[in-house]
């Protein structure tokens, strides 16, 4: 989930309800500043795609507005930003670099997974085949970014609920691949990826990107 102006909202993942829940969040944001900021790549994927539907699909837009009975129909006006996009585009990685008090000073691999990058047209987050935004953040925080082939492949996602063995194979393959390219640590922007990749047999630590921010900016222990 996520908060907007102190109000707890949820992306509501089930297929039938996720669009209506996301539309309500988008409409709320429209009337309270016009931007919706997400921390979770799964939430971001759902909300960004629903927003695209509300802009471009007359049928979806009409049905959603009729059901929600908004005072003013919602048509995709809200700008949806992932927190990392906000750091890059609104704060600036150069500005963040100037605030670093404890450079990370280690080799870190970015793990994008699926949901931040695909479908690329709707997400428009970064190049789906060769993303760089998280590597740029790592560098700004004083770390050495490590690129490796499996950084934008699937971690196993919700398969872990029914087939832990298959997810374990994905986890170990990704960790082994990252380690073979020199990564000492992995960083992700997806809670599910974090869950699936932790405790790998390769001993490659996996953290959320906010943990690196807190460490580099000197607020980790506060």
What residues fall within each predicted segment?
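Iron-sulfur cluster-binding electron-transfer modules in prokaryotic oxidoreductases
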Residues: 1-222
């Amino acid at each position: 989930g996520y908060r907007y102006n102190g109000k707890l909202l949820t992306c509501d993942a089930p297929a039938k309800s996720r669009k209506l829940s996301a539309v309500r969040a988008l409409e709320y944001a429209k009337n309270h500043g016009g931007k919706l900021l997400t921390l979770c790549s799964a939430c971001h994927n759902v909300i960004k795609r629903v927003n695209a539907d509300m802009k471009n699909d007359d049928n979806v837009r009409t049905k959603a507005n009729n059901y929600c009975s908004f005072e003013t129909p919602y048509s995709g006006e809200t700008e949806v930003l992932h927190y990392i996009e906000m750091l890059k585009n609104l704060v600036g990685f150069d500005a963040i670099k100037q605030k670093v008090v404890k450079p990370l000073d280690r080799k870190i691999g970015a793990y994008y997974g699926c949901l931040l990058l695909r479908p690329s047209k709707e997400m428009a987050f970064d190049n789906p085949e060769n993303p760089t935004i998280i590597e740029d953040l790592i560098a700004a925080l004083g770390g050495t970014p490590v690129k490796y082939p499996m950084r934008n492949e699937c971690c196993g996602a919700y398969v872990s609920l029914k087939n832990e063995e298959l997810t374990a194979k994905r986890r170990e393959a990704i960790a082994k691949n990252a380690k073979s390219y020199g990564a000492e640590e992995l960083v992700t922007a997806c809670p599910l990826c974090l869950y699936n990749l932790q405790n790998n047999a390769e001993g490659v630590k996996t953290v959320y990107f906010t943990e690196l921010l807190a460490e580099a900016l000197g607020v980790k222990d506060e």
